């Protein structure tokens, strides 16, 4: 009897110990997951020949989880806890570990802007953007809209895999300004014959990880886009994002990016990223009277201005509406680049950019207006 009681006591004690240990392990696991964040881990150029498996091992050995390895950037998107971040920063093969920041669409809320930048002058000459491919790196495009001709695309938003569904309406609006069809309905885009590609990197709330944007730019490079429109941005720089933007430009793509909607703050630049990078054309917004919109970001990085107040364009569901923002100004520049390339298909992206900037109409202090309002008629001469 005593032996039986002893056995029961031992069994109870073991059960209690196991339960406590399991609870402690669960608590540790919960504690670990709560501190995990999304990062981009960059590897040193001397390690460029390192295999994908080896790079994954470097991160995994530190407790990280690799989400995606990039094609043109020697880096990987990963989920890491604080300990893994510290250990990776010490690893001799790692160049940097940076947070995978979140970018947001730059919008606040007829196309008078089409006339304001002199696009109809090129239309009348027969140049409408034919044979020019424009990647709209945004929230997707409603491909069923009767005023849009979407030729292809891809989604890099894990939870929203259809690039032709636009939950925020932002990308569809941007697409219409670039290339709404000349079909007697709705609105007219800057380059109505340009080929639109929906590259989805923002979710239905208008937000997206930098790693999603990097994937989108890499897709544009691999698919030989001529123009990239990025009506998005964030307040924080990223080595990986700059690397892929620079790669896009060195690949011959014209890259237009929204300067941001942060307004002015004395002599401090409020231009966001990726527009802040020198390789992009940073676009600010003016109204129909060529006055800088109060929300338009300012700074020495600002390159040109375009209409961005009460811009009427396409919306999901076959509808239309007016939005404000440097997001709305940027597609005027992307569309203008498409018009120029349709007239001068042998021009390089550097030539297109130089013409857009050198022929812009002076509006005032470059800190607030860059080179001025684009004039695509003059730029295409």
From Swiss-Prot:
Inhibited by PMSF (phenylmethylsulfonyl fluoride). GO terms for cellular component: extracellular region. Its cofactor is Ca(2+). Residues 1-29 form the signal peptide. Ca(2+) 2 binds at residues 275, 277, 280, 303. Keywords: Calcium, Hydrolase, Metal-binding, Protease, Secreted, Serine protease, Signal, Sporulation, Zymogen. It catalyses: Hydrolysis of proteins with broad specificity for peptide bonds, and a preference for a large uncharged residue in P1. Hydrolyzes peptide amides. One of its GO terms (molecular function) is serine-type endopeptidase activity. Disulfide bonds: none annotated. Residues 30-106 form a propeptide. It is found in: Secreted. Ca(2+) 1 binds at residues 147, 181, 183, 185, 187. The active site is at residues 138, 170, 327. InterPro entries: Peptidase_S8/S53_dom, Peptidase_S8/S53_dom_sf, Peptidase_S8_Asp-AS, Peptidase_S8_His-AS, Peptidase_S8_Ser-AS, Peptidase_S8_subtilisin-like, Peptidase_S8_subtilisin-rel, S8pro/Inhibitor_I9. Monomer. Belongs to the peptidase S8 family. Subtilisin is an extracellular alkaline serine protease, it catalyzes the hydrolysis of proteins and peptide amides. Subtilisin NAT also has fibrinolytic activity. Secretion of subtilisin is associated with onset of sporulation, and many mutations which block sporulation at early stages affect expression levels of subtilisin. However, subtilisin is not necessary for normal sporulation. This is Subtilisin NAT. It comes from Bacillus subtilis subsp. natto. The gene is aprN.
């Amino acid at each position: 009897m005593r032996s039986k009681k002893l056995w029961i006591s031992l069994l109870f004690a073991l059960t209690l110990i196991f339960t406590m240990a399991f609870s402690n392990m669960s608590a540790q696991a919960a504690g670990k997951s709560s501190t995990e964040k999304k990062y981009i881990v960059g590897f040193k150029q001397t390690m460029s020949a390192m295999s994908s498996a080896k790079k994954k091992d470097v991160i995994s050995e530190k407790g990280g989880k690799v989400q995606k390895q990039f094609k043109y950037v020697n880096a990987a998107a990963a989920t890491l806890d604080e300990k893994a971040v510290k250990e990776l920063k010490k690893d001799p093969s790692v160049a940097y570990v940076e947070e995978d920041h979140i970018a947001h669409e730059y919008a606040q809320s007829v196309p008078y802007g089409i006339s304001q930048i002199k696009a109809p002058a090129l239309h009348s000459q027969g140049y409408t953007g034919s044979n020019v491919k424009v990647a709209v790196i945004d929230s997707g495009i409603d491909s069923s809209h009767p005023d849009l001709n979407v030729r292809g695309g891809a989604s890099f938003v894990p939870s929203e895999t259809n690039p032709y569904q636009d939950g925020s309406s932002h990308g569809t609006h941007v697409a219409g300004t670039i290339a709404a069809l000349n079909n007697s309905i709705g609105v007219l885009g800057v380059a109505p014959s340009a080929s639109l590609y929906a590259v989805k990197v923002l979710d239905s709330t208008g937000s997206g990880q930098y790693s999603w944007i990097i994937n989108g730019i890499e897709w544009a490079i691999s698919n030989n886009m001529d123009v990239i429109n990025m009506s998005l941005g964030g307040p924080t720089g990223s080595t990986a994002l700059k690397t892929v933007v620079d790669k896009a430009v060195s690949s011959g793509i014209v890259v237009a990016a929204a300067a941001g909607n942060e307004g002015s703050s004395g002599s401090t630049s409020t231009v966001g990223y990726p527009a802040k990078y020198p390789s992009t054309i940073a676009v600010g917004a003016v109204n129909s009277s060529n006055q800088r919109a109060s929300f338009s970001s300012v700074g020495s990085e600002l390159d040109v201005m375009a209409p961005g107040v009460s811009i009427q364009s396409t919306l999901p569901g076959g509808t239309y509406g007016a939005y404000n923002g440097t997001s709305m100004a940027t597609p005027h520049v992307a569309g203008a680049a498409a018009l120029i390339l349709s007239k001068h298909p042998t021009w390089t992206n550097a030539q297109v950019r130089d013409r857009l900037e050198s022929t812009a109409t002076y509006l005032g202090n470059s800190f607030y207006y860059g080179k001025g309002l684009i004039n695509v008629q003059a730029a295409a001469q």
